[in-house]
């Protein structure tokens, strides 16, 4: 377990007023999230919410034939399990750990109690949910209308925004599953980005070496998602900006 770990590494928790944060912190449980761990399956009853700190979780829509595609990615900016406070209790998506790390887990009844009690938490989580819905909608548009190259750029940028690093540990096969495309398409797209000097890929490890260049190659979808997130959650975006400066 990491020696210097704080629930405030999750930007949603860090954006809570001190009073609300202190009411929650003793009930937050630090848990490891191994790569590939399934936090919940489609249609399952949600018992906990998760606030990632150093992990990334993919929300996948699973078809009847078993095929799946990512509809959103959640990291240290967000929360896994929005259905709990939205009143649905279950969700049609599957939550799978995309990048191993840690998260803080909170029992569902405690989250709902605080959501009902605290107007500040209501506003924060509802604004986050709207930003998450924007990401889902834009991902659907991107998957339908943009090339695999552009989708990969968007995916890499959104993932890096949720990590305190410029490096991802990720196989091309896993990326292909997330994007819902053939592995060969990801191999070709990653090769183009590497030849352009934007990324370095080796043995399941992707390092972004030219982020401005990667953003220039991405379609509009990344900027749409980020702009809406920053508009709805300026307090959370502030914590992200500080983390990005520390990373440089």
Question: How should these model regions be labeled?
Answer:
Residues 98-100, 114-182:
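Polybasic "coupling" helices that flank or enter modular domains
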Residues 21, 79, 111-112, 214:
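A generic structural signal for short hydrophobic patches within well-formed alpha-helices
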Residues 24, 60, 82-83, 114, ...:
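Residues that scaffold the ATP/ADP-binding catalytic core of kinase and kinase-like folds
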Residues 158-248:
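Phosphate-/nucleic-acid-contacting segments
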Residues 1-34, 79, 84-85:
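Cyclic nucleotide-binding regulatory module and flanking cytosolic helices
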């Amino acid at each position: 377990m990491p020696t210097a770990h704080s629930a405030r590494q999750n930007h949603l928790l860090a954006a809570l007023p001190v009073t609300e944060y202190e009411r929650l912190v003793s009930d937050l449980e630090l848990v490891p999230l191994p790569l590939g761990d399934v936090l919940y399956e489609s249609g399952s009853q949600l018992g906990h919410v998760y606030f990632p700190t150093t992990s990334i979780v993919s929300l996948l829509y699973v078809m009847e034939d078993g095929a799946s595609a990512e509809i959103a990615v959640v990291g240290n900016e967000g929360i896994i399990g929005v259905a709990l406070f939205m009143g649905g209790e279950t969700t049609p998506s599957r939550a799978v750990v995309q990048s191993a790390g840690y998260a803080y887990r909170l029992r569902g009844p405690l989250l709902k109690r605080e959501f009902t009690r605290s107007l500040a938490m209501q506003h924060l989580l509802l604004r986050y949910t709207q930003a998450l819905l924007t990401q889902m909608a834009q991902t659907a548009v991107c998957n339908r209308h943009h090339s695999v190259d552009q989708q990969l750029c968007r995916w890499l940028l959104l993932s890096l925004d949720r990590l305190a690093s410029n490096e991802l540990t990720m196989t091309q096969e896993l990326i292909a599953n997330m994007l819902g495309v053939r592995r060969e398409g990801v191999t070709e797209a990653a090769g183009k980005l590497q030849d352009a000097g934007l990324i370095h890929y080796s043995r399941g490890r992707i390092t972004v070496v030219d982020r401005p260049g990667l953003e220039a190659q991405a379609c509009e979808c990344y900027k749409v998602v980020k702009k809406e997130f920053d508009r709805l959650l300026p307090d959370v975006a502030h914590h992200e900006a500080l983390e990005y400066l520390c990373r440089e």
